[in-house]
Amino acid sequence: MALSSVSSCEPMEDEMSIMGSDTEDNFTGGDTCAEATRGLVNKSAFVPTQTVGTVSALRNVVGNPPKSVVVSFSASPQRAQPSNPKSERPAFGHGRRNRRRPFRRNNWKQQQRGWEKPEPENVPARQSAGSWPKRSSLPVHMRLGQRGGDSSSADSGHGGAGPSDRWRFKTRTQSVARVHRNRRRGNANHGSNTPGRSAGDRLNAAAARSIADVCRRVTSSRIGEMFHGARETLTTPVKNGGFRAENSSPWAPVLGFGSDQFNPEARRITWDTLVEHGVNLYKLFEVRSHAAEAARSLRDAVMRGENLLEALASADETLSWCKMIVTKNLPMRTRDPIISSSVALLDNLRLKLEPFMRCYLSSSGSPTLAELCDHQRLSDVACVPTFMFVMLARIARAVGSGAETVSRDALGPDGRVLADYVPGACLAGTLEAIDAHKRRCKADTCSLVSAYTLVPVYLHGKYFYCNQIF
């Protein structure tokens, strides 16, 4: 068919040229001459003055059509559309290699095709049995990597299209826009996910105006009004009468809001008293929901403002309360005011003891304080301070998770870890550890830190106070 198409055309002159290109096919096979004839402008160019050698070369080209044939005329014809709309894409070894392909993210099912080998009649003529499959027939993770399960080398044949075959790595291209964007950020050697400040990272006008106008909004008289309003709010912290404990209840003096200041010695009780009357307080926390909600908020604020001795006493209060609940076989509710404040208590203790624990734990080869609170392993417990932090971290994790109750296994198998705990051990054991490490450690700075942890009196550190507003 190709020779008959050539014979129907007139020979071309010497200025005509036939060039091969590696672009997409515009016209192939027997349609080449017909498409060229429709786009002909200068018909005088087809005067039969061509030599026999030129006609023979034209017959060879048409008989063995290249990938693309472009015929140049004195006036360029209009580019014809391909006659075969289902033309196959060339194999991996031909054409442009770094062409960007659309990446399908959410339509994975559309890319899942049969892994069977194509039928012989469906295989294109240019794609042999040992050539690479088309890119569009493979998912991205197979085009950019090697598949396991095949002992053949990377240079062996890849005729099979099964998931057990191994594929070569595809050279990944870089987006031009991304490269320019990274160069503008001054970080062209890293990906776009590298943190960096963009050009729009600036303070907006409203925020700058609000900061500048604070001196006109806040005055000394305004500060006095703030404190006066806060005192009025604290005079009636709870509505609906609070916990409304009976006068005969041993917890009545401590359940009032704002009655008097807290005095540890005035509220000292024994372990036997806590076991005997602790259930009554447990039920009041459960029944008086409005008062318990206010108690949770106030206790959380109190836990964050305590000094070291008060914080250690609060740790003993929390662990003693949990031990009483385990002894009475009651659920440890996370909305209990004492248990829910374990998060604030842990944060305050870490803030107060972090400078001391840094040297104390490193000298004994124990994990850091952050690792103790994150991993919460009982195997890391070696002394009273580590026991206190691990147990409080386990309770705080249950509270922060949103669970209704703390599992008994959080306190060891069936809560048996607290069986050896004696109320008051957190305060006594931590003070003992600080003093023992102070005597043992030879570092001068550690001695200062240990002493200041025990007696936090101001010696040095603050240098000025600058306030131009009031």
Swiss-Prot record:
InterPro entries: ICP27-like (IPR008648). Pfam families: Herpes_UL69. One of its GO terms (biological process) is regulation of DNA-templated transcription. One of its GO terms (molecular function) is zinc ion binding. It comes from the Viruses. GO terms for cellular component: host cell cytoplasm; host cell nucleus. Zn(2+) binds at C359, H437, C441, C446. Its main location: host cell. A zinc finger (CHC2-type) spans 359-446. Residues 1-31, 73-202 are annotated as: Disordered. It is found in: Host cytoplasm; Host nucleus. Residues 94-107, 178-187 have a biased composition (Basic residues). Keywords: Activator, Early protein, Host cytoplasm, Host nucleus, Host-virus interaction, Metal-binding, RNA-binding, Transcription, Transcription regulation, Zinc, Zinc-finger. Belongs to the HHV-1 ICP27 protein family. Multifunctional regulator of the expression of viral genes that mediates nuclear export of viral intronless mRNAs. This immediate early (EI) protein promotes the nuclear export of viral intronless mRNAs by interacting with mRNAs and host NXF1/TAP. Homodimer. Homodimerization is required for transactivation. Associates in a complex with RNA, and host export factors NXF1/TAP and ALYREF; these interactions allow nuclear export of viral transcripts. Interacts with three host shuttling SR proteins SRSF1, SRSF3 and SRSF7. Interacts with host SRPK1. Interacts with IE62; this interaction enhances IE62 transactivation. Binds viral intronless RNAs and SR proteins through the Arg-rich region. This is mRNA export factor ICP27 homolog. It comes from Equine herpesvirus 1 (strain Kentucky A) (EHV-1). The lineage of its organism: Viruses, Duplodnaviria, Heunggongvirae, Peploviricota, Herviviricetes.
